[in-house]
Amino acid sequence: MSVVSSFHQSWKSLILASQRCNTVKQIKSTHSLFIIHGLHRNTYAISKLLTAFLHLPNLNKHFHYASSIFDSIEIPNSFVYDTMIRICSRSSQPHLGLRYFLLMVKEEEEDIAPSYLTFHFLIVACLKACFFSVGKQIHCWVVKNGVFLSDSHVQTGVLRIYVEDKLLLDARKVFDEIPQPDVVKWDVLMNGYVRCGLGSEGLEVFREMLVKGLEPDEFSVTTALTACAQVGALAQGKWIHEFVKKKSWIESDVFVGTALVDMYAKCGCIETAVEVFKKLTRRNVFSWAALIGGYAAYGYAKKAMTCLERLEREDGIKPDSVVLLGVLAACAHGGFLEEGRSMLENMEARYEITPKHEHYSCIVDLMCRAGRLDDALNLIEKMPMKPLASVWGALLNGCRTHKNVELGELAVKNLLDLEKGNVEEEEAALVQLSNIYFSVQRNPEASKVRGMIEQRGVRKTPGWSVLEVDGNVTKFVSGDVSHPNLLQIHTVIHLLSVDALQIL
């Protein structure tokens, strides 16, 4: 064997060894051999060594080492740049991916240019760093360079930029520019609507996807069920349930099963929610939280508290803050004052969970329901953190129920300080205070507060409700005149009113 052939064989073995590294110790050993054999100047070999960092479980700890290897390369190639941007996107410093991208585009070498992989990794880094404005600039870049229409991963990444920034109109425009979007892209768009509380729009996207002939995956189904839960679309939820049965996803996917439990519970079918829960072959803390939340909403406090014992006993699951919040809410609805107080006081000792504002809000609500407003105020004053609006809001609701003007004024004062600039929340607090004044016949003060509302330019948010008929969810808003079938609706209401008067 010639000397050259021997060198080539050694280099090949070292490069293969670098691809098998899964600990930093192995990477360092291989790097040392690279230096000994002169491979540390070979960009192909170094790119393979850098790729090994992606397999490390504690990448953040060794990010500086990866960066130093990159800095030792005299002229990195495109693959090395791509690898470093990818490492940044996986680390706790994703913003540095932009630095490597800028270094890359400054290179004067003709063969060093961003590819679709570069943009894909860069978009992932921007998403992790919440650099949405940069992501939009990348969108312009990929459109200008023709990458957007040619790569599916880049299309999905750009769509996610707008969805994560909650710019849903722009997200829809981007989506409509994608030729033949796959299920993943439909999922991203639908999830964007649902996360913003626009369940009806999310279901419309789901129906569009079905009309296009695409079959939903587990993620689509989970998101669609969440949308059904938001708007109370029980009929559509049942249809999805039948689809899930055919796919056997209740048994195989815990998130689909959990979404079904949550949907039935929020649509008023707690018994069906329990039946679905019993069929889950695997249950996690979210499954139990959905069931406990359902029990809490319908006042089944004892069943919710029993679930807290069962999840540890049956599944060996440690409750999280959401589960405990559900149990506290159940105690509030059921009037179990002592049990709720005991749980709050022992959360940290028993469950190693520090109570948050929402937990205190539940107990304040519970105390107010029991008429213990002074105790509720005492609890607020002893909180280890500054009370937020949710806590004072719970006290204000109790003051309205029990017509307590003094504490109501205190609660509103704190709410206005906390919600300064939030017009809707300011209006809600002032309306509550005026109602308290009216309830105790203090009409001058009530009128004064109403005047404050008008001076602030606060406009009351109209009430609304949704109704599902034949799978279509319609939103009815108080005072709305924009519905396309307004004339027919008013005609039917008039006829029903006439019939009702005749019956009376």
Swiss-Prot record:
Type E motif: region residues: 391-470
GO molecular function: RNA binding
Keyword tags: Repeat
GO term, biological process aspect, one: RNA modification
Short name of any one Pfam family annotated for the protein: PPR_2
Ranges of the PPR repeats in the UniProt entry: 77-107, 115-149, 151-181, 182-216, 217-251, 253-287, 288-319, 320-350, 356-390
Cross-referenced PROSITE patterns: PPR (PS51375)
InterPro entries per UniProt: E_motif (IPR046848), Pentatricopeptide_rpt (IPR002885), PPR_At4g14850-like_plant (IPR046960), TPR-like_helical_dom_sf (IPR011990)
Domain of life the protein comes from: Eukaryota
Region Type E(+) motif, annotated ranges: 471-501
Family from the record: Belongs to the PPR family. PCMP-E subfamily.
Name the record gives this protein: Putative pentatricopeptide repeat-containing protein At3g28640
Organism: Arabidopsis thaliana (Mouse-ear cress)
